[in-house]
């Protein structure tokens, strides 16, 4: 028995033969004629001619195995040109045609009449319909990356441990020590973004939310293989660079998701955008968040609303935001971070292309999403300034003054590790219970 496609090669299967003798051998368009030595449609003829004349070079993102089909022929120009050459289209015929045309124009003695195809038969036919999605499906590697990240996002947000009354939680610890064991800063209490009562934030809640967000974010960093592969010194620097921007990206998405006109926190409290309501909030919290809130809402949350951003885009943006190369990191650390950042950027690009109607729509959406990153970085710097003032002047915020918030937010702590804090005599070794019952 003859089994269909038993002897069909991989490239033949991915690029099926034309259904008739007059079909284009490149894309299967039924209206083919002989051009440059092979049966091809006007669209592929024009594409081949322009590619050879202008010496264009293309690059395929999918191992040079893209499907070249009539409706999707414009998806990958590299594979389309390769297919043109494979079916026998002669590049020399294109070059000789151009040489002949140039010679005729220079001599001017012999008028060579060349029948031009209608304007809409080459370039217009070569356009990809706007309702055709650039990619039929994502690569399985991208699907695995996204599935893993969404699973870890859910796991970290729902990671809850019983509160240990015998344990003390402190903000007066070294950064590296806190990174290795974030549970010493705060218990992994239940995350409650969407509280029904939604109280205004207080100084006690400010302190708790800072610590719980620290623990939550470090737990999430640990889900990324690139972060786990770093040495301790690189981890410490990367946490200082990205803890605040990643946190603000997370806060913004939750404010957008739960339609809160202000900053929503992990314990269900919030800080309002409305200046009138802000008068009901304690002065320390206004000092901390007052400068940040307007930009937070106008430049980040509103952008998410306009784009109708989804959770997949948010987690990929968080990974890109976190993995920031920097000259202060080791060479190996920068290599690991740069490779990981490119991986998540490619995953985001492919995901957006899959859900968008055409390359223009996908490009616009990707640009709008990436524009969020510098804004959250600025918000992080605003918080650095606010937190330094509060951490130095408010013992209610961090117990003994200075401590972990100072080390995280102080700019000079990025450059020196040994001198980022004073002697132990300046700080009381005081452990204050953090959890607020």
From Swiss-Prot:
Keywords tagged on the record: DNA-binding, Metal-binding, Nucleus, Receptor, Transcription, Transcription regulation, Zinc, Zinc-finger
Ranges that cross the membrane: none
InterPro entries given in the database record: C.elegans_NHRs (IPR052499), HNF4-like_DBD (IPR049636), NHR-like_dom_sf (IPR035500), Nucl_hrmn_rcpt_lig-bd (IPR000536), Nuclear_hrmn_rcpt (IPR001723), Znf_hrmn_rcpt (IPR001628), Znf_NHR/GATA (IPR013088)
GO molecular function, one term: RNA polymerase II cis-regulatory region sequence-specific DNA binding
BP GO annotations: cell differentiation; regulation of transcription by RNA polymerase II
Record-linked Pfam families: Hormone_recep, zf-C4
SUPFAM superfamilies reported in the protein's UniProt record: Glucocorticoid receptor-like (DNA-binding domain), Nuclear receptor ligand-binding domain
Domain NR LBD: 141-409
Protein name, entry field: Nuclear hormone receptor family member nhr-100
Native species: Caenorhabditis elegans
Gene label: nhr-100
């Amino acid at each position: 028995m003859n089994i269909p496609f038993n002897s069909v090669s991989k490239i033949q299967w991915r690029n099926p033969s034309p259904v008739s003798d007059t079909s284009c051998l490149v894309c299967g368009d039924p209206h083919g004629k002989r051009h440059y030595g092979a049966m091809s449609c006007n669209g592929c003829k024009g594409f081949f001619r322009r590619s050879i004349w202008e010496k264009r070079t293309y690059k395929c993102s999918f191992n040079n195995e893209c499907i070249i089909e009539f409706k999707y022929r414009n998806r990958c120009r590299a594979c389309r040109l390769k297919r043109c050459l494979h079916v026998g289209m002669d590049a020399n015929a294109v070059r000789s045609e151009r040489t002949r045309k140039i010679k005729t124009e220079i001599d001017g003695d012999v008028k060579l009449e060349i029948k031009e195809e209608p304007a809409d038969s080459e370039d217009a036919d070569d356009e990809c319909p706007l309702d055709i999605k650039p990619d039929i499906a994502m690569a399985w590697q991208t699907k695995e990356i996204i599935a893993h990240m969404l699973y870890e996002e859910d796991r970290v947000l729902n990671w809850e441990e019983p509160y240990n009354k015998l344990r003390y939680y402190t903000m007066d610890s070294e950064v590296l020590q806190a990174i290795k064991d974030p549970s010493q800063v705060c218990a992994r209490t239940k995350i409650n973004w969407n509280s029904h009562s939604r109280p205004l934030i207080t100084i006690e809640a400010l302190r708790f939310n800072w610590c719980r967000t620290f623990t939550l974010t470090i737990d999430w960093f640990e889900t990324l293989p690139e972060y786990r592969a770093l040495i301790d010194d690189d981890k410490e620097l990367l946490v200082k660079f990205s803890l605040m921007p990643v946190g603000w990206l997370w806060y913004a998405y939750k404010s957008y998701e739960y339609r809160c006109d202000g900053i929503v926190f992990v314990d269900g409290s919030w800080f309002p955008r409305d200046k009138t309501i802000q008068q009901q909030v304690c002065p320390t919290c206004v000092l901390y968040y007052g400068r940040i809130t307007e930009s937070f809402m106008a430049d980040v949350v509103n952008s998410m609303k306009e784009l109708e951003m989804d959770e997949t885009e948010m987690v990929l943006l968080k990974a890109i935001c976190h993995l920031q190369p920097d000259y202060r990191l080791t060479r190996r650390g920068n290599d690991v971070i740069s490779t990981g950042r490119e991986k998540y950027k490619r995953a985001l690009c492919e995901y957006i292309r899959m859900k968008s109607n055409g390359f223009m729509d996908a490009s616009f959406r990707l640009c709008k999403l990436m524009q969020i990153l510098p804004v959250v970085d600025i918000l992080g710097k605003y918080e650095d300034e606010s937190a330094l003032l509060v951490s130095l002047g408010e013992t209610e915020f961090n117990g003994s003054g200075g401590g972990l918030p100072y080390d995280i937010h102080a700019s000079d702590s990025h450059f020196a590790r040994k001198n980022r804090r004073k002697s132990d005599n300046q700080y009381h070794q005081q452990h204050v219970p953090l959890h607020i019952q």
